[in-house]
UniProtKB/Swiss-Prot annotation:
GO molecular function: structural constituent of ribosome
Pfam families for the chain: Ribosomal_L29
UniProt entry tagged with the keyword Coiled coil: no
Record lineage: Bacteria, Pseudomonadati, Pseudomonadota, Alphaproteobacteria, Hyphomicrobiales
UniProtKB keywords: Ribonucleoprotein, Ribosomal protein
Protein's name in the database: Large ribosomal subunit protein uL29
Organism: Rhodopseudomonas palustris (strain BisB18)
């Protein structure tokens, strides 16, 4: 999965955001295992996945707060 853009994230429904976070967490888990066993080639993907999760959660919180 490539780096997610904020416009794409804002267009997602809350359920889609939850699914995307779950998928990224699974990917991050697998990437950590690959790094531990020395099989990880694209080390920057770990950082991208972590930041994508944070980006999705931040936008979701902003949208939740805006509704109040």
């Amino acid at each position: 999965m490539a780096e997610m853009k904020t416009a794409d994230i804002r267009a997602m429904s809350p359920d889609q955001k939850d699914d995307a976070v779950a998928e990224l967490k699974k990917e991050r888990f697998n990437l950590r295992f690959q790094r531990a066993t020395g099989q990880l080639e694209n080390t920057s993907r770990l950082r991208e996945a972590r930041r994508d999760i944070a980006r999705i959660k931040t936008i979701a919180a902003q949208q939740r707060d805006a509704k109040k």
